[in-house]
Regions:
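Conserved NTP-donor binding/palm subdomain of two-metal-ion nucleotidyltransferases/polymerases, i.e.
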Residues: 1-244
Length: 244
C-alpha cells in the first residue's frame, strides 16, 4: 500500500552465498525448516524458525553488520527482548557451540553483557547459562562502537567505506589499504553493473570511484577518516578474538 510504513526485505538466503566472510554461515541453519514452528499473529498462522534458530540468526545478523561497518543498539535490544521472552525454549549451549564455529562467541556474550548492564536483559528470566558469561569481555569498547555506528553502520560515508578494511582483515588476516581504495570486481558490481559482463572495465570503475571520492569530499566522506575508522575497528575485531 502506498505510503505504508511497512517495509519488507526479501532474501533468497540468510547470508549472501558469494561472501568470502560469511557465505558459509548458512550451514549453521541446515535443517531449520524441519525444526520450524507455527505461530499465530492476528489470526494468521505463520511458519518460522524455532526459538533457538531465531536467536542464533539475530546474533549472526548483528555479527555480519559488525564485520562490515557496525550496527546500532536497537539490534542488541531485539536480542534482549527475544531472549527474555523465549529463553526457556532456547538451547543456549547449541547457540554457543555454533557461535564458536564462526569465532563469534566473545562478541555475542559481550553483547548480552551490554544488554544486561544497560538494557532490559534478565539472565534469570532468559535462562542464560553461566557458560556464556565466561566468554564475555570488556563491554565499553563494543558499546562505544554501537553508539558510533548508526542503525546499520551507516552513520557516515567514511564509516561505510571502512568496511573494506574490516572485511579484508577477516579474509586475509590483516587490513589492506589498497583493497580499500581499489576493491575487487565482485565488491563493485552493484555500484557499477556493467562489470557483471564486462569485467575488463574494472580499471574504469576504479577511476570513477576515485573521482567520486575526490568530487564529493565532505566531513562524513573522507578517505583518511575511513582508514582511521577501519584501523580502529580492525583492532576491535582482535580485541573480541574474531581475528588473531
Amino acid at each position: 500500500m502506498a505510503g505504508s510504513p511497512l517495509h519488507i526485505e526479501l532474501h533468497a538466503n540468510l547470508f549472501a552465498t558469494d561472501s568470502a566472510v560469511y557465505g558459509d554461515w548458512n550451514r549453521l541453519f541446515a535443517g531449520c525448516w524441519d525444526r520450524a514452528v507455527c505461530r499465530e499473529f492476528g489470526g494468521v498462522e505463520i511458519l518460522g524458525p524455532n526459538h533457538t534458530d531465531h536467536l542464533l540468526y539475530l546474533i549472526c545478523h548483528a555479527y555480519k553488520h559488525f564485520l562490515h561497518s557496525g550496527f546500532g543498539l536497537r539490534q542488541v535490544a531485539d536480542m534482549a527482548l527475544y531472549a527474555n521472552a523465549w529463553g526457556s525454549e532456547i538451547c543456549w549451549e547449541q547457540v554457543l557451540e555454533k557461535c564458536l564455529q564462526i569465532r563469534g562467541a566473545h562478541f555475542a556474550a559481550t553483547l548480552f553483557a551490554v544488554a544486561e548492564r544497560y538494557l532490559t536483559f534478565d539472565p534469570v528470566r532468559a535462562c542464560y547459562p553461566a557458560s556464556w558469561k565466561e566468554y564475555a569481555l570488556e563491554t565499553d569498547p563494543l558499546l562505544e562502537d554501537l553508539f558510533g555506528a548508526g542503525i546499520f553502520g551507516g552513520a557516515t560515508e567514511s564509516r561505510r567505506h571502512s568496511s573494506n578494511m574490516t572485511l579484508n582483515a577477516v579474509t586475509e588476516g590483516k587490513p589492506n589499504l589498497l583493497s580499500q581504495m581499489l576493491p575487487p570486481k565482485r565488491k563493485l558490481e552493484k555500484q557499477f553493473p556493467y562489470l557483471q559482463d564486462k569485467g575488463w572495465l574494472l580499471p574504469v570503475a576504479w577511476t570513477q570511484r576515485l573521482w567520486r571520492y575526490a568530487t564529493n569530499l565532505r566531513q562524513d566522506n573522507d578517505p583518511t577518516e575511513a582508514v582511521k575508522i577501519g584501523n580502529q575497528r580492525v583492532a576491535l575485531l582482535r580485541q573480541y578474538k574474531i581475528i588473531d
